[in-house]
C-alpha cells in the first residue's frame, strides 16, 4: 500500500539539511543517502528488535511522519566481509569435472541394459530415478543430453494407462506412472492426468488403490503421487483428488514409520511441495536426505558419485555466493542505505532468494540485479507506505518520469540520494542487459518503473481520501504495486537468452503469465500483511475489499476465499509455464516461475520479508552462509 499524509508538506518545509556531497556527481553507486535524525520528544528514532506499530514523529520542520520500527539488518557489512571458504580452489572444480564424466558413464550403462542390473523389467524406473535424482540434487545442467535421451526412451513406452517399471512390464504401476508423469510434464511432454484414474478405487470416491499395511514401497509410490499432483492444470479433478488423498496418507505414514531418510523426505516435500520449493533449497534438503539414505533403492546406481558431485557443486557455488554477497553489501553500505532508519534492510535475504533461484555461475548479473531491485523497491515501499508525504511522493514520481539527475532539484534531501541510487542502479543493470540482449533495454525498465510508481500514487490517493475500492479495482492497481516487474524484468534481461520484444510480451505485463504471477503475489502478500497494514492506517487490502463486497463475511471467510483463488491461479500458472504453444524460451518462464516460488516461500507462515523470522534466517544460513560437509 501507500502513504497516509498526516500533514501536507508545504514548499517551506522541504528538508534542507545537506547530507549529500554533490547532487550532480554521477559516479556509479556513489550516492550517499542521508541519515534522517528524526526525533520524537527528544529521543532518536532507532530500529527495534521487532516490527512494531507505526509511531508518529515530527522532523525539524514540524512535519508529522509515521515510522514503522522494523528490526535492524541482521547481517552487517563487517560480518559479510569476514566470510571465507576454501571451495574456490581449482582442485574442487577439477574433482567435480572428473565425477561428471563418470556419471555420464552411468547414464550410458543404464541405456546399455546389461541384462543383470538393468533389464527390460526395470529400465524405465531406473532412467526416471536417475533423472529425478540429478534434478533434485541441482546438477542436471551437466546432463541435459543424457536426460533428454532417457526421457525420450521412457515416453516411447507411455500409454493411456501409464507405464510399469520396465519396457517389458505387463502392468502399469503407481510409482513408475506418478514419477514418470511428473518428470515428463515438467519437461514438456504431452501427458494426460487421466492416467491416474486407473489407480483409483472403484468403490471409494477420491481414493487410490493402497494396501491395508503401509509398506515402504507403497509409501514411496504415494509420495510420488503427491509430488505429481502439485503440477495440476486447471480442471484436472483427478489431480485434486490425488493431492488430498496423498497428503492425508503421508501424514498418517509419518506417525507410523521410524525417523529415517524417507520420513525426512516426506516432511520436507509436505513442507515445501512444488510452489514454494526453490531449486537450491531443494538441493540442500535432498543432500541431507541422501546423506542418511541406506541406499537400498539405488542398487543399480552409484549414488555416492551423484551425492559427491552435488556437494562439490554446492560448495563451489558457495564460494561465488560469498564474493557476490560481499559486492552487494559494499553497494548497500557505500550507497548510504544503513542511514535510512525508517526502512527495512533485507538485501542479504533478497540475495539469498536470488541465489536459490539461479545457480548458474555465469548469471551473477541476475542474482545481484535481483537483490538490488528488491532492496530499492523495499525502501520505496517504506517511503510511499509510511514516511513520505503526499507532496513528496508526487514530486518523486514526477522526477522519476523525467529520468534526469537535474529532476532532483525540487526533492527533499533524503529523496535526492535515493533517486540517484535508483537512477544509477537501473542504468547499470540496463547496460549489462543491453550486452546480453544485443539491443537497448532501458525503456523496458523505465516503463515498468513508471507503472509501479503510478500504482503507488493511486493507493496514496485512496488512503488520503478514505476510499475503499472494489475488489477488482484494488487488484488492478495493487498487483502492480507489489513490484514483481521491477525485480524480475531487468535481472532476466541480463541472462544469456535473447528476448525480442515479441517474445518478451509472453512473460511481461500485461500478458497472462505475468498477470497471474502478479495477482498471486498480491493476494498472498495481503493474507500475511493485512493486519499489520491496517494497524498503520492502510485499510485497503484484498481482505477488506472482499468483506466490503460480501456483507456479513468474516476475515476467515475472506482468507479462505483468497487462498482458494491462489490455488486456482497457481494451476493456471502451471499451464502457462508448461504449455507448448508459446514462443517464449522456457528458461525465462522458469526463472519467472522460480521467482514466484521464492516469494511464496517467504509468505508461507507470515511476512518473512518484513520480519526476518527463524525460518528466513535458517534458509539464508543453509543456502548461502554455510557449506555442506564433504
Curated annotation (Swiss-Prot):
GO BP of this protein: diterpenoid biosynthetic process
Cofactor dependency: Mg(2+); Mn(2+); K(+)
CDD domains membership: Terpene_cyclase_plant_C1
Matching InterPro entries: Isoprenoid_synthase_dom_sf (IPR008949), Terpene_cyclase-like_1_C (IPR034741), Terpene_cyclase_plant_C1 (IPR044814), Terpene_synth_N (IPR001906), Terpene_synth_N_sf (IPR036965), Terpene_synthase-like (IPR050148), Terpene_synthase_metal-bd (IPR005630), Terpenoid_cyclase/PrenylTrfase (IPR008930)
Keywords: Chloroplast, Lyase, Magnesium, Manganese, Metal-binding, Plastid, Transit peptide
Residue range covered by the transit peptide: 1-52
Positions of Mg(2+) 3 binding: 525, 533
Cofactor notes: Binds 3 Mg(2+) or Mn(2+) ions per subunit.
Note: The conserved 65-Arg-Arg-66 motif may play a role in the isomerization step of the terpenoid cyclization reaction sequence.
Job of this protein: Involved in defensive oleoresin formation in conifers in response to insect attack or other injury. Involved in monoterpene (C10) olefins biosynthesis.
Protein name (database record): Terpinolene synthase, chloroplastic
Amino acid at each position: 500500500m501507500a502513504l497516509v499524509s498526516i500533514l501536507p508538506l508545504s514548499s517551506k518545509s522541504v528538508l534542507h539539511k545537506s547530507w549529500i556531497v554533490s547532487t550532480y556527481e554521477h559516479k556509479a553507486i556513489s550516492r550517499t543517502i542521508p541519515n534522517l535524525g528524526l526525533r520524537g520528544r527528544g529521543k532518536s528514532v532507532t530500529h527495534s528488535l521487532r516490527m512494531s506499530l507505526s509511531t508518529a514523529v515530527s522532523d525539524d520542520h514540524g512535519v508529522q511522519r509515521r515510522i514503522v520500527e522494523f528490526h535492524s539488518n541482521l547481517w552487517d557489512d563487517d560480518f559479510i566481509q569476514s566470510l571465507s571458504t576454501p571451495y574456490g580452489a581449482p582442485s574442487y572444480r577439477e574433482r567435480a569435472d572428473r565425477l561428471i564424466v563418470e556419471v555420464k558413464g552411468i547414464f550410458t550403462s543404464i541405456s546399455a541394459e546389461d541384462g543383470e542390473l538393468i533389464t527390460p523389467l526395470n529400465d524405465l524406473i531406473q532412467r526416471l530415478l536417475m533423472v529425478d535424482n540429478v534434478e533434485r540434487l541441482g546438477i542436471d545442467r551437466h546432463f541435459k543430453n543424457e536426460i533428454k535421451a532417457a526421457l525420450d526412451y521412457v515416453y516411447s513406452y507411455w500409454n493411456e494407462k501409464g507405464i510399469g517399471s520396465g519396457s517389458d512390464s505387463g502392468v502399469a504401476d503407481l510409482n513408475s506412472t506418478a514419477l514418470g508423469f511428473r518428470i515428463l510434464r515438467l519437461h514438456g511432454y504431452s501427458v494426460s492426468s487421466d492416467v491416474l484414474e486407473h489407480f483409483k478405487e472403484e468403490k471409494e470416491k477420491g481414493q487410490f488403490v493402497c494396501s491395508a499395511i503401509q509398506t515402504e514401497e507403497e509409501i514411496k509410490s504415494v509420495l510420488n503421487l503427491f509430488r505429481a499432483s502439485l503440477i495440476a492444470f486447471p480442471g484436472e479433478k483427478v489431480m485434486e483428488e490425488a493431492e488430498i488423498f496423498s497428503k492425508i496418507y503421508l501424514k498418517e505414514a509419518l506417525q507410523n514409520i521410524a525417523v529415517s531418510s524417507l520420513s525426512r523426505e516426506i516432511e520436507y516435500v509436505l513442507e515445501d511441495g512444488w510452489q514454494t520449493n526453490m531449486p537450491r533449497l531443494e538441493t540442500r534438503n535432498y543432500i541431507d536426505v541422501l546423506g542418511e539414505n541406506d541406499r537400498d533403492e539405488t542398487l543399480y546406481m552409484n549414488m555416492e558419485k551423484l551425492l559427491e558431485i552435488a556437494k562439490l557443486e554446492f560448495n563451489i557455488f558457495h564460494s561465488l555466493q560469498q564474493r557476490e554477497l560481499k559486492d552487494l553489501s559494499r553497494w548497500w553500505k557505500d550507497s548510504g542505505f544503513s542511514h535510512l532508519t525508517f526502512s527495512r534492510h533485507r538485501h542479504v535475504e533478497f540475495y539469498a532468494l536470488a541465489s536459490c533461484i539461479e545457480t548458474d555461475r555465469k548469471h551473477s548479473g541476475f542474482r545481484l540485479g535481483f537483490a538490488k531491485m528488491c532492496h530499492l523497491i523495499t525502501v520505496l515501499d517504506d517511503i510511499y507506505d509510511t514516511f513520505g508525504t503526499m507532496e513528496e511522493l508526487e514530486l518523486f514520481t514526477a522526477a522519476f518520469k523525467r529520468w534526469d539527475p537535474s529532476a532532483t532539484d525540487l526533492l527533499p534531501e533524503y529523496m535526492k540520494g535515493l533517486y540517484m541510487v535508483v537512477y544509477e542502479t537501473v542504468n547499470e543493470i540496463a547496460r549489462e542487459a543491453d550486452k546480453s540482449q544485443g539491443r537497448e533495454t532501458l525503456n523496458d525498465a523505465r516503463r515498468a518503473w513508471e507503472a509501479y510508481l503510478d500504482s503507488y500514487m493511486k493507493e496514496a490517493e485512496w488512503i488520503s481520501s478514505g476510499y475503499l475500492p472494489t475488489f477488482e479495482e484494488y487488484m488492478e492497481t495493487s498487483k502492480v504495486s507489489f513490484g514483481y516487474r521491477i525485480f524480475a524484468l531487468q535481472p532476466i534481461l541480463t541472462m544469456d537468452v535473447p528476448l525480442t520484444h515479441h517474445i518478451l510480451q509472453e512473460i511481461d505485463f500485461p500478458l497472462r503469465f505475468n498477470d497471474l504471477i502478479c495477482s498471486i503475489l498480491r493476494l498472498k502478500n495481503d493474507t500475511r500483511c493485512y493486519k499489520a497494514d491496517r494497524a498503520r492506517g492502510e485499510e485497503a487490502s484484498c481482505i477488506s475489499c472482499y468483506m466490503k463486497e460480501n456483507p456479513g463475511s468474516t476475515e476467515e471467510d475472506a482468507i479462505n476465499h483468497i487462498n482458494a483463488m491462489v490455488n486456482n491461479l497457481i494451476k493456471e500458472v502451471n499451464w502457462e509455464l508448461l504449455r507448448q504453444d508459446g514462443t517464449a524460451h522456457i528458461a525465462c518462464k522458469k526463472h519467472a516461475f522460480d521467482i514466484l516460488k521464492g516469494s511464496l516461500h517467504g509468505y508461507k507462515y507470515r511476512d518473512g520479508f518484513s520480519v526476518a523470522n527463524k525460518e528466513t534466517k535458517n534458509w539464508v544460513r543453509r543456502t548461502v552462509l554455510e557449506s555442506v560437509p564433504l
